A protein has these predicted regions:
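Surface-exposed extracellular loop regions of Gram-negative outer-membrane beta-barrel proteins
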Residues: 132-133, 138-139, 241-249, 314, ...
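Short acidic/polar hinge/loop motifs at secondary-structure boundaries
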Residues: 1-20, 103
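Periplasmic-side early beta-strands and strand-to-turn transitions of outer-membrane beta-barrels
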Residues: 32, 45-47, 67-156, 186-189
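Structural signature of Gram-negative outer-membrane beta-barrels, strongest in the C-terminal barrel
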Residues: 120, 221-225, 231, 257-384, ...
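Face-selective signature of the C-terminal outer-membrane beta-barrel domain
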Residues: 106-124, 150-299, 374-382, 431, ...
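Outer membrane beta-barrel strand-and-loop segments of large Gram-negative receptors
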Residues: 205, 209-215, 257-264, 268-270, ...
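C-terminal beta-signal and adjacent terminal beta-strands/loops
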Residues: 386-387, 391, 438, 478, ...
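Gram-negative outer-membrane beta-barrel transporters
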Residues: 277-278, 382-384, 405-492
Length: 608
């Protein structure tokens, strides 16, 4: 998939700090194009064991933390959803089921050494609620049949495990990191959603990476710091695909079936230096990174993927700072792209295969009113993308295929696409002050990629206007109220292809296909959502109780989106009815997918 679901696999209660880099990425953090988000998990308490239990309307959660010895501690979290029960009760056609775990173990045998072991993983299943399409007397019977006919069943699990050793020295430290991560992704569909029928789509892929990084950080004289290091990764990928695809040039369905696997070495090196000048009013930083991989012959030479970056921060007046950065960044093509095969040949792994590139420039002002914990910043940015993968079949950038769930990149591509994004962001932050806190962020952005004719068109992420306001008030006696207001401009979308309503195409796909000659030529309306949450906490001698009530989408606003195109169906059986006026085709009908449901929730949190 190209975007996450409503619940992240990282439990935010275990997060101590998040560093977000919209530019000026640290040279030690590679394989990123547009931004980097670095999570730091909190260390467990070392005095006693405690427990935190959460019971909400969508999931159960348990967090434990405490000492595992005189110089070590452990914090771990487990969550299990029952959101599928709620979705089934209100008659939704899909039933998401998720489970996840997370832990961090820390040992400090002496003042010079620290060892950290981190792990997280998730098991996600996406079921179809076939029971809602059994009663033809229901008002929305035909709509449910249509949606169930278009959805795949998905199975996914993944994990990441790693160990880090920090060796502290008088002038800095050494850091050694070894880790392993794996993703298993399955998507399939039976004809008419009947397991007795053959599979019409069957996709299974696995990504496995074993990583090592050695990093040296030095504190030098005169306010100067330096970081350098090397990295190595051993990756394995396999893919089994069986499906049919519509060829837009011929209008015919073509079979695609292959099995592919490869192993690859990835390697790189980095260096970065920072220095504070002018009585620490000016901070400058410069870095360089190179990366290479044996996944394709065009990726082997690391000197082709050199990524310089430079940044500066100047405090020109009390509370005021000017920041600017520029850089070139590289990212390896997705394994799904590199693993696509025709026969025995991986057609996207050739001399012409290249890393994706981004050249960006960011500059802005920041004012920090520390007396009242208030911060204001404004920033402008430009990012230019090169070597973006272009679908050989559809002639569009894969970046324009990624605004929904599904498999992206499992096809032949060329690496000659261009894209760009530019805009500005305003941020106002009120840290806790007299019980109040809040954050307001407004972003104006234009995001564009080339279409098949070489013209820039809006990308699938081109919201243009995004406004987010989060705030709250802490009262005495354990009461707290929080709100979040989100406003987002409408996303562009591509209309459906008239040829996908042919009997041959619809009987196979069960859904309309898109007309990429009209790529993102339509746009949805703007969207807003208001969430409200109220907490009441009671503190006892050895435990505390938090009862919360929240309402998501309190105003009942519907998400604007294009109608779901279906075909005329038999009202008793749900079967498509051939057109009486256009032989070989079905007639169209439209389903309004807008859903403005108000979602109340009630839960408790117990800390022991």
């Amino acid at each position: 998939g190209a975007s996450g679901g409503p619940v992240g696999m990282i439990n935010v209660d275990l997060v101590e700090n998040i560093d977000f880099y919209a530019g000026a990425f640290p040279a030690a953090r590679g394989n990123a194009l547009s931004s980097v988000m670095e999570f730091s998990f909190k260390e467990a308490r070392t005095d006693e064991w405690t427990a935190n239990m959460v019971v909400g309307t969508s999931d159960l959660g348990l967090t434990l933390e405490g000492p595992t010895g005189e110089k070590s501690s452990l914090i771990m979290s487990m969550r299990r959803s029952y959101l599928q029960l709620l979705f089934e009760a209100i008659g939704l056609p899909f039933l998401p089921i998720y489970n996840d775990y997370q832990f961090k173990w820390t040992a400090r045998p002496d003042d010079r050494n620290a060892i950290t072991v981190i792990g997280l993983g998730a098991l996600d299943n996406f079921e179809l609620n076939l029971g809602i399409a059994q009663d033809s007397a229901q008002d929305n019977y035909l709509d449910q049949v249509a949606i169930l006919g278009a959805l795949d069943i998905q199975r996914q699990w993944n994990y990441t495990q790693g160990v880090k050793w920090d060796r502290y020295q008088d002038n800095g430290k050494w850091t050694f990191v070894a880790s392993r991560n794996m993703l298993n992704n399955r998507a399939f569909k039976h004809l008419d959603n009947d397991e007795e029928n053959p599979l019409i789509r069957d996709y299974l892929s696995q990504e496995i990476e074993n990583k090592f990084r050695a990093e040296r950080k030095l504190f030098l004289k005169e306010g100067m710091e330096a970081t350098y290091g090397v990295l190595y990764e051993y990756a394995k990928y396999n893919n089994s695909t069986s499906e049919k695809r519509l060829n837009p040039a011929t209008g015919a369905l073509e079979s695609v079936a292959f099995q592919s696997d490869f192993k690859a070495h990835k390697y790189g090196a980095f260096v970065q230096a920072n220095r504070r000048l002018m009585q620490e009013r000016l901070t400058v930083s410069a870095g360089m990174r190179i990366d290479g991989s044996t996944a394709a012959s065009g990726l082997v030479n690391p000197l082709k993927q050199w990524s310089p970056r430079v940044s500066a921060s100047f405090a020109f007046a009390p509370g005021w700072t000017f920041n600017a950065n520029a850089g070139m960044y590289s990212q390896l093509p997705a394994y799904t792209i590199l693993g696509y095969a025709v026969g025995d040949a991986r057609v996207n792994a050739t001399d012409s295969t290249s890393y994706l590139n981004n050249r960006q420039l960011v500059a802005g002002l920041k004012w920090d009113g520390s007396e009242k914990n208030f911060v204001v910043s404004v920033e402008g940015f430009f990012k230019g993308y090169q070597n973006s993968p272009i679908s050989s079949l559809q002639g569009v950038a894969l970046a324009n295929l990624g605004a929904d769930f599904g498999v992206v990149g499992n096809e032949a591509v060329t690496f000659d696409g261009l894209g760009r994004s530019y805009g500005a962001e305003l941020l106002l932050q009120q840290r806790l002050y007299k019980g109040f806190y809040g954050l307001l962020a407004y972003t104006f952005v234009r995001s564009e990629f080339e279409d098949s004719s070489g013209e820039f068109v809006p990308s699938s992420w081109d919201n243009r206007h995004i406004l987010s306001m989060t705030g709250g008030k802490k009262f005495e006696n354990g009461w707290e109220i929080g709100t979040r207001l989100l406003f987002s401009g409408g996303l562009p979308y591509t209309p459906t292809d008239a040829g996908s309503y042919s009997i041959e195409s619809w009987d196979f796909y069960g859904r309309p296909l898109l007309d990429y000659s009209l790529l993102n030529s339509e746009r949805n309306g703007a969207f807003h959502q208001l969430d409200i949450r109220i907490d009441k906490k009671w503190f006892f001698e050895r435990w505390s109780l938090d009862v919360f009530m929240e309402v998501q989408n309190a105003t009942g606003a519907a998400v604007p989106q294009p109608n779901f195109s279906d075909v005329v169906r038999n009202p008793l059986t749900g079967a498509p009815v051939p057109s009486q006026t256009q032989p070989g085709f079905y007639d169209q009908r439209q389903i309004d997918p807008s859903n403005g449901a108000i979602l109340p929730a009630l839960g408790i949190i117990i800390e022991l």
